[in-house]
A protein has these predicted regions:
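A cross-taxonomic marker for long C-terminal extensions/tails that follow the last structured domain
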Residues: 6-9, 112-133
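Extended interaction regions within the primary functional domain
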Residues: 12, 38, 92, 116, ...
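Amphipathic alpha-helical interaction surfaces in cytosolic regulatory modules
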Residues: 48, 62-117
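Short, well-structured hydrophobic secondary-structure segments
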Residues: 37-62
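STAS-typified acidic loop motif
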Residues: 3-46
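Surface-exposed, flexible loop/turn segments at secondary-structure boundaries
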Residues: 38, 107, 133
């Protein structure tokens, strides 16, 4: 008998225009890595938003979401906010949620973009250096 709370991982391989996405409830991995400027943001991000929405209904007791972005456009930023708002619902219901925004030492653009997103959502974002860029 399968576990009704089980959720298949969502794994998206990176392309030149799309980030690598790993959403794996069982292993506790929630990562967004690379560059994000998909040609059709709605088509790209809808399954991600749906997956996180389902996860929010039965989350792990602790969730760590990692962003290791090199670049993302404004459409992607809007979807990142939407995704983080779903993780925010988990926090509001009493589970632990942590967001880590990785950046290179000198990448002020990615630091500022992370701060812009942090200002919009009610999730604290921890900024963590990856080293020199």
């Amino acid at each position: 008998m399968s576990d009704p709370l089980a959720q298949d991982p969502l794994l998206i391989k990176p392309t030149e225009d799309e980030p690598e996405i790993i959403l794996d409830k069982e292993r506790g991995i929630f990562q967004f890595t690379g560059s994000s400027m998909p040609e059709d943001p709605g088509t790209f991000f809808t399954p991600i938003c749906d997956w996180v929405g389902s996860y929010a209904q039965s989350p792990n007791s602790s969730t760590v979401v990692e962003f290791k972005m090199d670049y993302f456009n404004s459409s992607s930023a809007r979807y990142f906010v939407e995704i983080l708002e779903k993780f925010e619902e988990i926090l509001d219901r009493g589970s632990d949620v942590k967001v880590i925004w990785f950046h290179f030492d000198d990448d002020m653009v990615m630091i500022e973009r992370g701060e812009d997103i942090e200002a919009v959502v009610s999730l604290p974002i921890e900024f963590r250096k990856l080293g020199p860029g």
